[in-house]
Amino acid sequence: MFAQALHWLTTSKLRYALALPFLFFILYTKTKKSKEQELENYIFSLPREKLDQIRGKPDEVINVIDEYVEQGHFLMNIGKLKGKIISEKIQQVKPKVMIELGGYVGYSAILFGKQLTDPSAHYYSLEVNPKFAKIASKIIDLAGLSNKVTIIVGKATDSLVELRRSLPNVIPSFEYLDFVFIDHWKDLYVPDLRVMETLDLIGQGSIIAADNILRPGVPEYVKYVQGSLDYRKEYDSTVSNVNGPQFIGKWNIIYKSKTIKVDDGKREKDAVEITEYIEAK
């Protein structure tokens, strides 16, 4: 069909002149790489000596990505400052099982996965976009963390249901997720938390860290984790979960939650939300 349209457009000088901007646009969109592919290109086009130098070194791979961003290439990574807050919490908690909702290009999986020093600890990165997952897999492998990080491609709800089924078989002592990092679609923060509550993936000792609390902002999520039991009871009973009505959530969970603001002096202020499961009433 494209070839026929191209023939029709180019068989007349007038049509050709009128179509030239359109043709350039088509060629541009067909050949233009996404910013995530450009990152992949940048990393794996480094001199072999440099690649060998950073291979198997998570910190060095993170530095390369940070340098790329500092050159003016925007990526949806958590970055150094907010990442440091969560990394310190991971070091304190020492999770055995950690998951993230929104793996993107693998930055957070590398940054946080390297904190899991226990040989039996594992990091599950849930990513809905197969193209992002493919890029992340290559970068995580470069960092030497393929044995520590498992990427699961698909809708978060489906992946969470599968993890609930499979984790007890992989880890016989598994009860709850030790640590959850949320950094995907902002309108899914609350719905996916309710999925985890319903599936009993959140329990005694679970920590939930969420990004982009102020920019672009997730006020509904903050209100949910900081709200009273009465608030969540009404919310769960009146707001249907977009992931399915069966994932109603558990309003009787008592959370201790805090918004931690970060300002790098260059961009608008942002924050992370650190939420701890205290008990269920």
UniProtKB/Swiss-Prot annotation:
Its cofactor is Mg(2+). It catalyses: a catechol + S-adenosyl-L-methionine = a guaiacol + S-adenosyl-L-homocysteine + H(+). One of its GO terms (cellular component) is fungal-type vacuole. InterPro entries: SAM-dependent_MTases_sf, SAM_O-MeTrfase. Keywords: Catecholamine metabolism, Magnesium, Metal-binding, Methyltransferase, S-adenosyl-L-methionine, Transferase, Vacuole. GO terms for molecular function: metal ion binding; O-methyltransferase activity. SUPFAM superfamilies: S-adenosyl-L-methionine-dependent methyltransferases (SSF53335). Its EC number is 2.1.1.6. Its main location: other. GO terms for biological process: catecholamine metabolic process; cellular detoxification; methylation. Gene3D superfamilies: Vaccinia Virus protein VP39. Binds 1 Mg(2+) ion per subunit. Belongs to the class I-like SAM-binding methyltransferase superfamily. Cation-dependent O-methyltransferase family. This is Probable catechol O-methyltransferase 2.
